[in-house]
């Protein structure tokens, strides 16, 4: 297993022999700047991992190849669901072709989470402000990647995903680990009153008369409600909006923002 890379954070370093996982950032801060490409937004010259944000798919594919090589996962099929900000979870092990030789990229439709009990796949979800969560149960040998923006958090996708996995015996809440990645933190996630009315009040605050939502705290509470131990929940703590040198942010940079990823694979 490769050592931690400058362009991703490993949330489960103590389990390197069983799992490889990471929350990526916008690129290696020590790397020389990419040569300017006229007409290409600057974000796309960084480590953009989103195939559906307007970047050249070939360039995105090369970026993914860099991440997978740095993490020792090259050669494995990549599973990235086509997300809808909902609460559905795809099972990579049940995807067509999953038992034989799947293509390099599998994109299950209409899911914002994906799980697997196999070492064949790299599971990933992408984001540019939304929270992502990685799930790993070292005893059961199950991994999952979850995309939970405010809509997914409202739909309780992390809670539902954990309950589905526990209900099918694929994780045990007392042994499962949950890692929360970089996202808009409460001080940066300003919302209007119409959105605030849809969210649990205990995770809302007022800053300068405006509503703010604590997305990580809400998802942490969902994990605890499923029986995940508090000491098994780890939060990277980074804010995408406030750290432009390390993270893309749709709210800060607009539609041409790149995308980061949360990825995980059994070894």
Which role fits each region the language model picked out?
Residues 1-267:
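Active-site microenvironment for binding and transforming phosphate-containing groups
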């Amino acid at each position: 297993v490769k050592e931690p890379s400058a362009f991703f954070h490993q949330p489960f370093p103590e389990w390197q022999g069983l799992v490889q996982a990471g929350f990526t950032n916008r690129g290696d801060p020590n790397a020389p700047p990419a040569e300017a490409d006229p007409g290409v937004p600057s974000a796309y010259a960084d480590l953009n991992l989103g195939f559906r944000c307007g970047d050249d798919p070939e360039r995105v594919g090369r970026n993914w190849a860099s991440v997978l090589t740095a993490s020792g996962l090259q050669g494995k099929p990549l599973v990235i669901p086509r997300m809808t900000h909902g609460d559905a979870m795809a099972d990579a092990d049940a995807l067509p072709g999953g038992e034989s030789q799947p293509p390099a990229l599998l994109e299950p439709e209409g899911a914002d989470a994906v799980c697997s009990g196999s070492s064949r796949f790299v599971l990933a979800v992408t984001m540019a402000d939304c929270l992502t969560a990685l799930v790993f149960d070292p005893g059961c040998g199950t991994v999952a990647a979850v995309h939970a923006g405010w809509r997914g958090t409202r739909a309780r996708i992390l809670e539902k995903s954990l309950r589905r996995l526990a209900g099918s015996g694929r994780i045990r809440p007392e042994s499962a680990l949950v890692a929360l990645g970089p996202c808009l933190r409460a001080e940066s996630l300003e919302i209007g009153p119409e959105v605030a009315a849809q969210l649990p009040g205990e995770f809302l605050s007022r800053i300068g008369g405006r509503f703010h939502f604590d997305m990580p705290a809400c998802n942490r509470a969902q994990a605890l409600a499923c029986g995940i131990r508090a000491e098994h929940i780890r939060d990277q703590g980074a804010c995408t909006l406030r750290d432009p040198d390390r993270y893309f942010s749709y709210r800060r940079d607009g539609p041409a923002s790149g995308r980061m990823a949360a990825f995980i694979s059994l070894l």
